[in-house]
């Protein structure tokens, strides 16, 4: 399996099969398998890798791929610590072996992912830079349109309550009082000294005595006499 992977890496037509991950916070200890830059530990033997792990104080167990990943992670963490911690008077580091120098030169070309969010507390590992909350306020209601309406009796009672009923009663009482005064006799004084009393009002329901003329009396008398004579003749025929 390692031989096939080594052959693909040496092939000029082979494209890197690494996938980049966008992250807003720095990752201090990434896996070297996600890096597109090949490391120099691939050409070393297992014994050499174990010696290097023993020199750095790392665990010796595992396969060759595990040893390579362990060494690459240690190199990356060392470079990250050097980039974060800055000293005013840097001291020259002791000379390292050619293998360590090559690993450092390879890892310096890796661009570190930084975050725009400031660290608010010690050990803050949050991956959220900012959040946007939706606007939860309800919109204001539109102003009501006032429409004028024609006045009516129900509206007056509903608006003014018992005052409208009291006013209607007063008006009805005043009208009745006026009608009562109009039915009382009124005296009219003339210049000659005569006094005439007149009644004003509705006389349609009053019944009065009407004088009949002479012709009317004769006609009515004739009708009554004819009816009486006819009745008398009928009664006389029944007796016989």
Swiss-Prot record:
Residues 41-75 form the SAP domain. PROSITE patterns: SAP. Residues 22-45 have a biased composition (Polar residues). It is found in: Mitochondrion membrane. Its main location: mitochondrion. Keywords: Membrane, Mitochondrion, Transit peptide, Transmembrane, Transmembrane helix. GO terms for cellular component: mitochondrial membrane. It is a single-pass membrane protein. Pfam families: SAP (PF02037). InterPro entries: SAP_dom, SAP_dom_sf. The chain crosses the membrane at residues 218-235. Residues 13-48 are annotated as: Disordered. Residues 1-28 form a transit peptide. The keyword Mitochondrion applies. Belongs to the AIM34 family. This is Altered inheritance of mitochondria protein 34, mitochondrial. The gene is AIM34.
């Amino acid at each position: 399996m390692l031989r096939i992977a080594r052959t693909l890496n040496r092939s000029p037509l082979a494209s890197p099969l690494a996938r980049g991950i966008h992250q807003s916070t720095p990752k201090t200890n990434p896996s070297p398998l996600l890096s597109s830059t090949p490391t120099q530990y691939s050409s070393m033997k297992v014994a050499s890798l174990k010696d290097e792990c023993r020199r750095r104080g790392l665990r010796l167990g595992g396969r060759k791929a595990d040893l390579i990943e362990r060494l690459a992670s240690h190199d990356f963490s060392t470079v990250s610590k050097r980039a974060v911690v800055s000293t005013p008077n840097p001291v020259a580091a002791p000379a390292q072996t050619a293998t360590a120098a090559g690993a450092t030169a390879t890892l310096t070309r890796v661009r570190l992912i930084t975050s725009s969010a400031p660290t608010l507390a010690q050990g803050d590992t949050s991956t959220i830079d900012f959040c946007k909350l939706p606007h939860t306020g309800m919109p204001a209601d539109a102003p009501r349109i006032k429409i004028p309406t024609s006045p009516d009796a129900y509206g007056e009672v509903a608006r003014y309550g018992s005052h409208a009923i009291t006013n209607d009663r007063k008006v009805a009482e005043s009208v009745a009082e006026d009608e009562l005064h109009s039915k009382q006799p009124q005296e009219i004084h003339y210049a000659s000294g005569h006094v005439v009393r007149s009644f004003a009002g509705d006389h349609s329901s009053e019944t009065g005595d009407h004088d009949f003329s002479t012709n009317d009396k004769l006609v009515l008398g004739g009708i009554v006499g004819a009816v009486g004579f006819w009745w008398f003749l009928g009664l006389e025929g029944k007796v016989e």
